[in-house]
Amino acid sequence: MKYFRADLHVHSRFSRATSGRLNIRNLAAWSMIKGLSVMSTGDFTHPAWRDELRRDLVYDDNSGLYRVREKTPLETEIPGFSRPDGVSEPQFLIQAEISSIYKKDGSVRKVHNEIGRAHV
């Protein structure tokens, strides 16, 4: 894949202010609606989320990324939507974030570092 669209800053449902319905199939469905080829998983350090990643994703030797083990039709996951023409199933990058929050000159500063990992 020469060019691709990706969302590399994602959180799992175990993070604050995220949907309780968020799971791998839901991320895959929304990525197809948005025309994304690669999604990150977010929060790979959370034990329950990591268990779901191991259960729901399978490693793709060709790309070095992961794909959904058991595909759910987009229409089933998100009623009222259908897969746009030419959009394929997304691949997943195992990812987490380190958020560094500090004060400087009386202002709060935040730096978000995204960490990718080869295997779950």
Regions found by a protein language model. Give the residues of each.
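Generic start-of-chain signal for non-secretory N-termini
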Residues: M1-R5, H9-H11
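Extended substrate/RNA-proximal surfaces in nucleic-acid metabolism proteins
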Residues: Y3, W49-H119
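Active-site neighborhood of phospho(di)ester-bond hydrolases with catalytic His/Asp-centered motifs
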Residues: D7-L8, M39-D43, L93-Q95
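Histidine-centered divalent metal-coordination motifs
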Residues: H9-R13, A118-H119
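Catalytic metal-binding/acid-base residues of hydrolase active sites
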Residues: H11, T45, E97-S99
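Acidic/histidine-rich helix-loop elements
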Residues: S12-G20
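Short, acidic/polar
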Residues: S19-S31, K103
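Divalent metal-dependent hydrolysis catalytic cores, especially in the metallo-beta-lactamase
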Residues: A29-W49
